[in-house]
């Protein structure tokens, strides 16, 4: 099948990285995939390395009069059966044609941007329920989860390379330094975890505020903000527990990454983690914005490694059943076959 995937997103982010993984997986499975991306030489190189030939376009603001016609020409030349527009900006530029237009949502976006789409895909059941509650026909709304790379078996990084003393407990958090991610809640929890260090791997507009909060809480020496890093698997292998303290998290790819790496997960009960986790079985859930509850849950895992291992093994089982590449790719291919234009 010929499938075009249109992504106008940022260089880093959960949706953008899954777009790459899915494009590569579909290609390896024998589908013919055209990735159309916002100009990003690094993403283009990664896709080209996997044998794809990405088209790079501007995907600018309201004054961008060039991307629409160029996208239309690229799609007409490729002649896909299905076009998948990832998120609102791509859907705004995509037009109907001799293909089925699918919008893929990873959050609670304005559905007016997807008005030309014939089908919508959400990556959580809660998101699909929200889509249909807005009046979208249920038969044209579909749940298709993400898959993440299998990170089990990675070699732990030396504590010194992470800036963490030998013997210290390590709490890992991953994501953009944005208020939605709730990393300030994790920092406020840290004074109640005197033997633990927090490694918050990501970059974003909240860096200065998080650094100031760490100083104010007296934990600056135990909070590490290394920026974006490629070695996620090594960091997961090095930590004692993964924290996902988000205020707002439609899915929570990091939860699934933690499961894949056999790491115990403690998450705030935002939309995605609350749907993913079975409390006290494959992770621990705490109320959002509750530093005390977060500290208690993290402390419980750090004090009782056996219970943490049990959570981690149950999470690994969930990953293998529902979020590994093979089962998710099979669902995507079945969906594409069911909607493709003859």
Per-region residue spans from a language model:
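Short hydrophobic beta-strand element within catalytic cores of glycosyltransferases
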Residues: 36-37, 264-267
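Short His-centered aromatic/hydrophobic patch
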Residues: 63-67, 84-91, 105-106
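A short helix/loop element that forms part of the nucleotide-sugar donor recognition site in Leloir-type
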Residues: 153-165, 307, 316
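A short, well-ordered alpha-helix in the C-terminal region of glycosyltransferases
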Residues: 211, 300, 307-322, 328-331
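Aromatic "clamp/platform" in nucleotide-sugar-dependent glycosyltransferases that forms part
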Residues: 228, 247
